[in-house]
Amino acid sequence: YRCFCSSERLSALRSEQMANKETPRYDGHCLSLDPEESEERSSNGTTYVVSLNVPTEGECIFHDELRDEIRIAWSQVDHQVLRKSDGFPTYHLANVVDDHLMNITHVIRGEEWINSGPKHVLLYEAFGWVPPKFIHLPLLRNPDKSKLSKRKNPTSIFHYRDAGFLSEAVVNYLGMMAYTLPDKREVFSIADMSETFDTSRISLGGPIFDVSKLKWLNGRYLREQLSANDLLARLGKWKFNDEFLGKILPLALPRLETFSDFGPLASFLFAEKVEIDTDSISGKLEPADAARLIKTAEWELEKLREWEGEPIGNVFNRIAEIEDLKLKQFMPTFFVAITGSGVSLPLFEAMAILGPDLS
């Protein structure tokens, strides 16, 4: 149905509901509009969105391949906007249409999407389409059982690639998350898993993503699955190759007197993490200020579309301008955070080589 409510009305409604300690949701005001009036206002060019007509009573019942029957009261489902005022569809509408047109048979997603199930079921019914099978997987957890987030462990797959993990080991480890092979073995290929995969063997308990266990498994692959020649080839493909070393050498050369100087200067570019030498920081900031600036830099760097030395440097120059600081006042903190030392290769160019995930 068309909804003509202004942003002011919606904001006032939200404020009133929050003041009454109610869950903010649309009240279905425009659902009661006479169809002729709705058509007339649309024809006159009045701005509107298209919202999902959700039943007011009863509950949505749908089947999950892992959880069997899921029941959610319609009163808990909001009137989702399906098409924005500019004519573009929102995620929920686009998702259902795309899945249907691509003949998707199984929708496999995280359990945080369970509450969106009724919206999608309602859309499939509205279109007269047979919905796919739904599988809502348990979310990965940190060792302390908290929800997996990059604040505690890196979550980008590119981080583990750049840090030197084998793709086979990462796939193997992810395959172990909430799933076990019938013979209980821990080292297996994706082909092995494909041959025996059965959704009924997936555990609903929150699987723990433990980096130390991943490292242990990766070590087994290095020692048991690869020959010496394979290892040399993989090391070369990873970072010990002319292309990667060729990027570092121009930065290191002005600081080299012997070949043995190269290792200490460039070692951070081959490490997943660095040992922090806080004593080497000159012009120290207060810890709270340093933490705030590091977080600010992280947010700003995440916006970069071009990960090169100059754009990276521009980010730090903007931070210096906003904070009314000189670069020399806070850059030592970032030198140590990235390289582990207050003396190293030119930082912006080194970060460009290191990549966004490890940086």
Model-derived features: positions:
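Active-site cores that bind ATP or allylic diphosphates and position pyrophosphate for catalysis
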Residues: 6-136, 141-150, 156, 181, ...
